[in-house]
Amino acid sequence: MAEAPAKKLTVSATEVAVEIVNMNKWYGDFHVLRDINLKVMRGERIVIAGPSGSGKSTMIRCINRLEEHQKGKIVVDGTELTNDLKKIDEVRREVGMVFQHFNLFPHLTILENCTLAPIWVRKMPKKQAEEVAMHFLKRVKIPEQANKYPGQLSGGQQQRVAIARSLCMNPKIMLFDEPTSALDPEMIKEVLDTMVGLAEEGMTMLCVTHEMGFARQVANRVIFMDQGQIVEQNEPAAFFDNPQHERTKLFLSQILH
């Protein structure tokens, strides 16, 4: 993917979208996340990088309570995530998530996949939900696929449907968990281009990815994780050109060719 200077978009200096304070998570005796502290401002675009098993996907899954943290605090759009199911639902309504695997319903058409949540969760009338869905399918450049089923689409097209489906809920924050890692190389660019478009419109984004060209182009900040900890974070130019931590230097030397 061709690299370009990051566009100077408005990032709120005062409005916090996500705040994580001393967050820890265990799987049994395994300490998967250690004392995570992170503040994401409205409109900020953050790329989270790191080796497999570093905890990066687990961290963003905690942001919409797909994973439960055992210690510390997570506040999303002013709501603290606890065991309160009502608060969890409040957060999930405002946070879209796109996964490595598309998670589309195979027995529903593309249009039906996109209208399901707005109709059932937002209580949107069907006609309005279909209009919203077509708007976002046009935005990700696949409106002609609306009446097809997921199995009739390429992997790149299915991932763009997954992005459109999330946008139909009008989220304030988008989380991406390695959205291109399951795609064939020739399909990666079409998905990244869609994500670049979202970033250019000012969407608050946290993205776990190994696509470092995307990080250079889009991110306000790149975070490097290893062994369940945030090891280093900086603006893209400083992160890539002058990494401070030896573990970051080693990772970049292995991933950048």
Swiss-Prot record:
Keywords: Amino-acid transport, ATP-binding, Nucleotide-binding, Transport. Residues 18-252 form the ABC transporter domain. ATP binds at residues 50-57. GO terms for molecular function: ABC-type amino acid transporter activity; ATP binding; ATP hydrolysis activity. InterPro entries: AAA+_ATPase, ABC_ATPase_HisP-typ, ABC_transporter-like_ATP-bd, ABC_transporter-like_CS, MetN_ABC_transporter-like, P-loop_NTPase. Gene3D superfamilies: P-loop containing nucleotide triphosphate hydrolases. PROSITE patterns: ABC_TRANSPORTER_1, ABC_TRANSPORTER_2. Part of a binding-protein-dependent transport system for L-amino acids, affects the uptake as well as the efflux of these amino acids. Probably responsible for energy coupling to the transport system. The keyword NAD does not apply. The lineage of its organism: Bacteria, Pseudomonadati, Pseudomonadota, Alphaproteobacteria, Hyphomicrobiales. CDD domains: ABC_HisP_GlnQ. It comes from Rhizobium johnstonii (strain DSM 114642 / LMG 32736 / 3841) (Rhizobium leguminosarum bv. viciae). Coiled coil: none annotated. This is General L-amino acid transport ATP-binding protein AapP.
